[in-house]
């Protein structure tokens, strides 16, 4: 798994269940001081974990997520929850016009439909549930604002 380099800013994880921090430089401030009150789940759709982490953490790719949940259940944090990760693109939902500013983005390592769409391992699902529960408690996210898309 790629490691953070000395020139990358490091931060303290927002959750005690985070096993590693690999900082992404692809983030910004939340618009108008907006607080995150939504969780958006994605799967990576890439053939391997190294490629997915490189895509999310390499400066200039203009994509990131707050968390990555690995197949073995480990959780990597790439962007502090207080910041705006770039995982939702130009998107709209239930009157929200800037999903990146109101959400915590979680990428779930899975090759997706282009590579046979394997089942999500039970360890990965358990870790994802624990992570989401913690975020929901910390940020007071109601269950109807936990969303997923491919």
Language-model-derived ranges and their functions:
Residues 2-142:
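Active-site-adjacent loop/helix surface patches within enzyme catalytic domains
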Residues 145-150:
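Short, intrinsically disordered, charge-balanced linker/junction segments flanking boundaries
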